[in-house]
Structure formats: structure tokens, C-alpha cells
Amino acid sequence: RDLVRSRGLGDVYKRQLLLTHNMKNTDYNWTAGIYGINVDSNGEVTLSVLIRSEVTITGKPKNGKGNDVVFKFKIKKWFTSLGATSSNTWDIINTSCSYGQMPSSLELAQRPSGGVVPRKVGTLWGEYGNLKTYGNAFSSTDYWTSTQLMGVHEKFNPETGISELGTGKSSGLCVEYY
């Protein structure tokens, strides 16, 4: 068993349960037993509310044979877009993260290698990929980060995962830690 996506995204959190040893999510009936959590037949977990405690997901074999499969996880970071309409200077966006803070570019994605940003657990873009595919929450072309080089803050591209030095206005992104 393995888990991906330890970060919340926008107003809804999704997490895909991964099984090993030729096991299939569709062979199990999934339950969480907590309000605000839904697990579909493909093993995708959706949290419609932020749950700060550890979450346990249980899969019972549909054929009644074999052991239950149990997944446990806890949200460590919750990322929220201030929306594409929040386009403003870095200083104004930074003060808009009153319930958290602006993330660093390395929390959002690793640096590209050969022009490609790696997809792997540990960063928001690494776990979710193109954030623009998740609806209007990440529809802006770029977002300010807390990362600063030579006195200039970086902007993060939610489509490519690449951060570059930026000026002018951009949208806001905040992160809360748990």
C-alpha cells in the first residue's frame, strides 16, 4: 500500500489510494466513517472539509475473502488559491494570507531538470501536476511565492510548475501547516 497527495488543494482535498500486489481499488468497499469524507469505488478520497486529525480509510474485500486494507494519513499542508481575480503586487498578496503564509517556490515544485519539473510526492505541483486542471481555483497564469532572489520574488506557474523571477502583479496562494 502506498499513499499519494499529502497536501490539500483549494476548497476540496483529493487523495488517490494506491494498492500493490495486483490489488485493485474496485475490489473493495471503501469507508471512512467521518463526516466530510467520501471514498469512491476507485479509491479516490475527497475531503469537503478540513480534518486536522488522522484519517483512517478502510477497504473491505467485496468477495468477502482476504484481509481489510487500511490507510491512515494526516493533512500536513493546506494550499488555498486567492483566485485569479486577486492579481496584485507581492506586498498586498502577502498580507492577504492572514490565516497562513505565502508558500516558497520549493514547497510548490522542485526545480526543473532538463526543462522538466519532476512529478513526485513532496511538493504541491509534484503531487497534483498541472493545477489548472482542478477548476477555477488555479486559473491564473502565475502566483507569487515567498522565495526571493537578488531582492526579487519568484512567480509560480501552476500549469508547468516552473518558478521564475517576477515583477508587477500576480495572483495569490497561501499555505497553512498542521
Task: Please place each PLM-identified region on the residue numbering.
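Conserved hydrophobic ligand-interaction patch in extracellular adhesion modules
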Residues: 76-148
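Extracellular/periplasmic catalytic domains that process cell-envelope and extracellular macromolecules
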Residues: 51, 66-68, 96-97, 135-139, ...
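Short, structured beta-strand segments at or near domain termini in extracellular proteins/domains
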Residues: 57-59, 64, 69-77, 144, ...
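Short, polar loop/linker segments at the starts of domains and inter-domain junctions
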Residues: 85-95, 152-165
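Strand-loop-strand motifs at the edges of beta-sheets in extracellular beta-sandwich domains
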Residues: 33-50, 161
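Single conserved hydrophobic/aromatic residue that forms the stacking wall/gate
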Residues: 2-13
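Exposed beta-strand face motif in extracellular beta-rich ectodomains
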Residues: 51-57
